[in-house]
């Protein structure tokens, strides 16, 4: 892998990480078809790419994360509970499917359809939405269980968690913020699992640094665009738009 390839892969990760499609699936497909990597190597490299977007979250939400140090913070409780239940589904699935790469198109199509259905239901009825402080323990548990399934290549972590939060009535800007922040322990856990499983991947220092920088910059920019977008559209139209983006991006490989 040279520096230019690393730059492209990092940008692909940064752009797709926060969209309701699988960044892991997209980067793995690129590495397998473009670079000729083995699926296990591509999975390890895809997990490594998440480090850049994780750093983007830490920088973008540094004030909120510092506020989490208060043990009574609702955000802190949400992160802890969601992370625990992510492990319940994520660890067994990782161990079972690490060597079996699947595209996950059906899961992505389901996520897109659910987002559109949620938006349409909200258009038909008046619905109050919850802010961060109103998220319940049940919301946290469902969020964590859903995030665990995103360890599978092709299943979108952001799409899955965003769908759960929106269907539970959480405001779109809070839903995005929570989805971004709970990715941090999820990424750290995935990296630890990959290392414990004996990751076969060895990345040279220059391509590795380029991938991290590229995924960080594009990930930060994409996050900022989505947060601005969420504040300027209605709750229902936000769901419908994100669902349509999901379905459109899922169809792209078929067109190509």
Curated annotation (Swiss-Prot):
Reactions mediated catalytically: di-trans,octa-cis-undecaprenyl diphosphate + H2O = di-trans,octa-cis-undecaprenyl phosphate + phosphate + H(+)
Top-level taxon of the source organism: Archaea
EC identifiers of the protein: 3.6.1.27
GO molecular function, one term: undecaprenyl-diphosphatase activity
InterPro entries in UniProt: UppP (IPR003824)
UniProt entry tagged with the keyword Coiled coil: no
Keywords: Cell membrane, Hydrolase, Membrane, Transmembrane, Transmembrane helix
Localization: Cell membrane
Class of enzymatic activity (EC top level): hydrolase
Cysteine-cysteine disulfides: none
Major place of residence: membrane
Protein name as annotated: Undecaprenyl-diphosphatase
């Amino acid at each position: 892998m040279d520096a230019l390839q690393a730059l492209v892969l990092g940008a692909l990760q940064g752009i797709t990480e926060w969209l309701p499609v699988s960044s892991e699936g997209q980067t793995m497909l690129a590495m397998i078809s473009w670079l000729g990597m083995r699926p296990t190597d591509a999975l390890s490299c895809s997990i490594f790419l998440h480090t850049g977007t994780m750093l983007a979250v830490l920088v973008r939400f540094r004030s909120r994360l510092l506020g989490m140090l208060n043990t009574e913070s609702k955000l802190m409780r949400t992160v802890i509970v969601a992370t625990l239940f992510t492990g319940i589904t994520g660890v067994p699935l990782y161990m079972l499917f690490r060597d079996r790469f699947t595209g996950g198109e059906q899961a992505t199509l389901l996520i897109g359809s659910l987002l559109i259905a949620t938006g349409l239901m909200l258009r038909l009825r008046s619905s109050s939405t919850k802010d961060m402080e109103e998220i319940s323990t049940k919301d946290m548990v469902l969020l964590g269980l859903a995030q665990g399934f995103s360890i599978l290549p092709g299943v979108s972590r952001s799409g899955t968690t965003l769908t759960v939060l929106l269907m539970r009535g959480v405001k779109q800007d809070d839903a995005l913020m929570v989805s971004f922040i709970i990715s941090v322990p999820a990424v750290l856990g995935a990296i630890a699992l990959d290392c414990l499983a004996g990751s076969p991947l060895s990345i040279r220092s220059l391509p590795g640094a380029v991938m991290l920088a590229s995924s960080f910059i594009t990930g930060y920019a994409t996050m900022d665009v989505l947060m601005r977008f969420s504040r300027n559209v209605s709750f229902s139209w936000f769901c419908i738009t994100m669902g349509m983006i999901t379905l459109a991006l899922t169809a792209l490989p078929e067109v190509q």
